Amino acid sequence: MRSVSPQSTMARIPERRVRTLDFAQFRHGEPSGSRGFCRELVDCLSSVGFVKIRNHGISGQEIENVFVMSQLFFSLPQAAKGKAAHPPEANPHRGYSYVGQEKLSRVKDYEKGKREITDVYDIKHYPIDRDARQESYDQGAAVDNLYPNRWPDEQDIPGFRVLMETFYERCHEVHQDILRAIAIGFDLSPSFLTDLCCQNTSELRLNHYPSVHPSSLRKGAKRISEHTDFGTVTLLFQDSVGGLEIEDQNTPGTYFPVLSERKSDIIVNIGDCIQRWTNDKIHSTSHRVVLPEDTDALTKDRYSVAYFGKPSRSQLVGSLREFVKEGEKPKYNDISAWQYNQEKLVLTY
């Protein structure tokens, strides 16, 4: 994971186009078109770290239903959300986290060995914590017996559990297909990466960034500090409010916005584990959530849904020999995916 220079963390440039790919070319296209898609996908992820995909198999109505349910959940009284509360400590990483409970800024330079708590300018409207300005709900696979899910009461929000478990499985299918496409793009067996993720340990998250009035802001306010994701591939669904920015790979420390032309588009980004496996052939790109410059947007709530793909817990996440060229050295030592995730996770709570 690369460092973000303190002098340039607030540098911003106009929107640069993150390419949008048609996933139907991979799933339903001719073999030549499918392989071409895979190579283009790897090219996008290697150069930018992010890509948008459409025609991925999850319908617009399914996505809309999750956003509606997310708004209903976060509008519940605090006591109702608290019935599914995330514990004060990192584990189990399940349930509802209140505004400021998670502190992602603590791990933004983890691979550089910088693990101290960093101070960032944030929204003084919420004095709980200076690092994070969101509330969230996390769940894992229904079959994950190590970390069972924490659900709100059915009478408080009918249908929540069924809808969320179903959507999790839909995202899991897309995650597996993206891993296959990346493997093919590297001229490897389609199952090369999915075999490393056969235990379903991925997580689905609902995010709510409460509305903010301009009078409550100070210079440099952020909703979420710079960070990279822990796992393999992240699938992000976001509303029209905006605020997601990613680091320019050619100018470290400079960020540009990523907008969704359609709510049904999935924004895909690489996580740390694939960066480690590929020996930096693909980087996990630093990203953050800032407040939109549009004055009207400042008063709006922002919602997003993220699926964090992860390897099997026992799988090692050091550099794989398939990605270490002759004359190169492995950049990452072996460590289990579970231990790597835990070392970073415990810093965020």
Curated annotation (Swiss-Prot):
Cofactor-binding details, from the entry: Binds 1 Fe(2+) ion per subunit.
Gene name, Swiss-Prot/TrEMBL: ppzD
EC nos: 1.14.11.-, 1.14.11.57
GO MF annotation list: dioxygenase activity; metal ion binding
Annotated catalysed reactions: L-proline + 2-oxoglutarate + O2 = trans-4-hydroxy-L-proline + succinate + CO2; L-proline + 2-oxoglutarate + O2 = trans-3-hydroxy-L-proline + succinate + CO2; D-proline + 2-oxoglutarate + O2 = cis-4-hydroxy-D-proline + succinate + CO2
Binding sites annotated in the UniProt record for Fe cation: H227, D229, H287
Protein name: 2-oxoglutarate-Fe(II) type oxidoreductase ppzD
Keywords: Dioxygenase, Iron, Metal-binding, Oxidoreductase
Signal peptide bounds: none
Source organism of this protein record: Metarhizium majus (strain ARSEF 297)
Keyword Iron listed: yes
Database matches in Gene3D superfamilies: B-lactam Antibiotic, Isopenicillin N Synthase, Chain
Family membership: Belongs to the iron/ascorbate-dependent oxidoreductase family.
